[in-house]
Regions:
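Short, flexible loop segments at the rims of nucleotide/cofactor-binding pockets, characterized by
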Residues: 5-10, 126, 164-169, 193
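Active-site environment of divalent metal-dependent phosphoester hydrolases
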Residues: 11-13, 36-39, 80-82, 157-161, ...
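Structured beta-strand-rich core segments of catalytic domains in phosphoester-bond hydrolases
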Residues: 35-147, 249-252
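Charged helix-capping and loop-helix junction motifs
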Residues: 52-57, 165-174
Length: 265
């Protein structure tokens, strides 16, 4: 069973992302920064006080069309205005998505906000302190005859950096509560995503209390598209390291400003 996680950057590098999605071999694909604009396809432009980025209007549908034998699950954290190529304004949903191969029965789904709560931004997207949702899916791995719970998370972005803060401590506690509620005794548990943390964050101590061990450590999880010096962002934690057959922080191909994380169990 292969689990793959990457911050998709709203599909900004869709020319590279699309063929990779089809070929990466994910049984469970966890994406962060996923977009959906009802009634619109193609390209939009996202703007906040710090950035202006091209994004796919409906990355959820774009990826789904390339994984027709996967079940899509989408948890929206917030929504706001984007512009189409004719400068028309549309409301775009933003969140995390998990695509599960049809060979894996989905036996449980749960989502929760780990920071804030759902917001509709009417006067533009804020640069920071946006709400964050996490999405947990519990599947049955038939060949291994076991249940696997996979939690997909996009952590709080703070303009001041990735250091621990009271908000990140609260986020870790909420995440731990979601993991506890979503899994059952004996489940292999995987938590993955763009956590926006430093490797020494107390979040890892809190999750270690649930038996979760980080596999990434201080590895570089950013690509050449990211120009800032701090190269830590994405992580993958597992409850049973002995079950891991393969783990990789994928340096190539580059499909985002984040490197993908892939694990075989």
């Amino acid at each position: 069973m292969r689990i793959v996680s990457v911050n998709a950057w709203g599909g900004a590098m869709f020319g590279e992302l699309a063929p990779w999605v089809e070929s990466c071999g994910a049984d469970v694909l966890c994406l962060q920064e996923v977009t959906r604009t009802p009634g619109l396809r193609g390209w939009t432009r996202f703007d906040d006080a710090e950035r202006s980025l091209p994004q796919r209007a409906d990355l959820l549908a774009d990826v789904g069309s390339r994984l027709p034998r996967h079940q899509p699950l989408f948890a929206v954290s917030d929504s706001g205005p984007v512009l189409d190529q004719e400068r028309g304004s549309h409301r775009q949903d933003f969140g995390v998505a998990t695509f599960v191969a049809e060979t894996l029965p989905v036996v449980g789904v749960r989502s929760a906000f780990v920071h804030g709560g759902y917001v509709e931004h009417h006067d533009g997207w804020p640069a920071g302190d946006r709400p964050r949702a996490a999405l947990a899916v519990r599947v049955y791995d038939r060949p291994a005859r076991r249940f696997v719970t996979v939690v997909n998370l996009h952590g709080l972005r703070d303009a001041s950096g990735k250091a621990d803060s009271p908000a990140r401590h609260a986020q870790a506690e909420r995440l731990a509560a979601l993991v506890t509620g979503a899994r059952e005794d004996g489940d292999l548990t995987v938590v993955c995503g763009d956590l926006n943390l430093l490797p020494d964050s107390e979040t890892f101590r809190i999750l270690a209390g649930l038996g979760l061990r980080d596999l990434v450590g201080d590895a570089d999880t950013r690509t050449s598209r990211y120009r800032r010096p701090v190269r830590h962002a994405s992580y993958l934690l597992v409850s049973d390291p002995a079950a891991v057959k393969e783990f990789e922080v994928v340096a190539a191909p580059e499909v985002s400003d984040h490197r993908a994380l892939t694990i075989a169990v």
